[in-house]
Amino acid sequence: VGFKAGVKEYKLTYYTPDYETKDTDILAAFRVTPQPGVPPEEAGAAVAAESSTGTWTTVWTDGLTSLDRYKGRCYHIEPVAGEENQFIAYVAYPLDLFEEGSVTNMFTSIVGNVFGFKALRALRLEDLRIPVAYVKTFQGPPHGIQVERDKLNKYGRPLLGCTIKPKLGLSAKNYGRAVYECLRGGLDFTKDDENVNSQPFMRWRDRFLFCAEAIYKSQAETGEIKGHYLNATAGTCEEMMKRAVFARELGVPIVMHDYLTGGFTANTSLAHYCRDNGLLLHIHRAMHAVIDRQKNHGIHFRVLAKALRMSGGDHIHSGTVVGKLEGERDITLGFVDLLRDDFIEKDRSRGIYFTQDWVSLPGVLPVASGGIHVWHMPALTEIFGDDSVLQFGGGTLGHPWGNAPGAVANRVALEACVQARNEGRDLAREGNEIIREACKWSPELAAACE
């Protein structure tokens, strides 16, 4: 027999500290918490093995392939500052292990099996470096930031949105009315809630019809292009595509998808359809916290955001930064840049473990949504800049005078902040004053500020 059977240490094969990473490798940074007594090198090597070619023993078919060409390699390990028994293990995967243009296959390979591994107490995927050669096999976002601005004819400011509430229970006609009021007041977009699909109280086709009516009516009144994120998420891919086709037939500008609950395969199909048919695609991240909330186990949202840019979407929810802890701000802005920019430098203070080159893959607009209102507008304008969508749900619909005045208040606040910024004023310091000044000209804003 040419080999010894039996259990062997992973680090003999898969821990290669002198490996020079290739430009075509997919690189991963894992936060590893080994079980007591397991050395970090063994834990890191185990991750590399289990997420690539390895199994727990030598098998005779190993002789039929070139392990050196196909194995994942743990090439560097560093302790995590301030945590005991946590390490960052860097793993390099040869590109040949992955199917072209498939986020699904990339995740199945890298995170499919290894998270249940006994030698690890916990494991978190912190970041991925996607090589240019692999990026080029993806279509990416259907349109991207610049094309979206051209389609909507809106420049030099963030876009404004609003989720229609109450999210469940309205009839289609009343729902359409709420959409119309918001758009008429000055918002660019309104949004289906992520769990509005096609329930007994409001079937999807009725909702699409009444929302389209609201869009056309408000466009005629305001002279601006309007949109409503029609949620096409469904129980089957076929049904999802049927909804997207109907949206296209109505001539509306944008549809929406829940990419984690719907799955990457469905999302990529929808993104391809959207590019072929001129629809923008808004992405909601329902279920993300199940995956990304634990600090020591799961997948960091920046990886899910990168995956979405590859799979395809023109907007994605990315948190608000406002009112959160300071440390969160840098981390959030780190993955906001990963969504928007062509080239992002490695910067550990912002949680970016690798330099990422997206070559010419279109960018994604980050969406700030959840618990924000007009007083946050100066901070949001400063933090997110022009290329973003700011969504005020309760902040619009909670206005004492109704939806349209609520929309007016948000639009006035936004225009005031953009104008102040363009005049060189400091939004962080003078924010409240800027909003108060604008209140003098807008009774709607004044009412919202009380």
From Swiss-Prot:
Family indicated by similarity: Belongs to the RuBisCO large chain family. Type I subfamily.
Source species of the chain: Sedum rubrotinctum (Jelly bean plant)
Lineage, top ranks: Eukaryota, Viridiplantae, Streptophyta, Embryophyta, Tracheophyta
Entry note: cofactor: Binds 1 Mg(2+) ion per subunit.
Gene that specifies this protein: rbcL
Keywords: Calvin cycle, Carbon dioxide fixation, Chloroplast, Disulfide bond, Lyase, Magnesium, Metal-binding, Methylation, Monooxygenase, Oxidoreductase, Photorespiration, Photosynthesis, Plastid
SUPFAM superfamilies for the chain: RuBisCo, C-terminal domain, RuBisCO, large subunit, small (N-terminal) domain
CDD domains recorded: RuBisCO_large_I (cd08212)
UniProt protein name: Ribulose bisphosphate carboxylase large chain
Enzyme class: lyase
GO molecular function annotations of the record: magnesium ion binding; monooxygenase activity; ribulose-bisphosphate carboxylase activity
PTM description: The disulfide bond which can form in the large chain dimeric partners within the hexadecamer appears to be associated with oxidative stress and protein turnover.
Gene Ontology CC terms, in alphabetical order: chloroplast
Function: RuBisCO catalyzes two reactions: the carboxylation of D-ribulose 1,5-bisphosphate, the primary event in carbon dioxide fixation, as well as the oxidative fragmentation of the pentose substrate in the photorespiration process. Both reactions occur simultaneously and in competition at the same active site.
HAMAP family for the chain: RuBisCO_L_type1
Pfam families documented for this protein: RuBisCO_large, RuBisCO_large_N
Annotated active site: 165, 284
Site (described: Transition state stabilizer): 324
Enzyme Commission (EC) number: 4.1.1.39
Subcellular location: Plastid, Chloroplast
Modified residues (N6-carboxylysine): 191
Major localization listed first in the record, in broad terms: plastid
UniProt binding sites for substrate: 113, 163, 167, 285, 317, 369
Entry-annotated residues carrying N6,N6,N6-trimethyllysine: 4
Catalytic reaction(s) noted: 2 (2R)-3-phosphoglycerate + 2 H(+) = D-ribulose 1,5-bisphosphate + CO2 + H2O; D-ribulose 1,5-bisphosphate + O2 = 2-phosphoglycolate + (2R)-3-phosphoglycerate + 2 H(+)
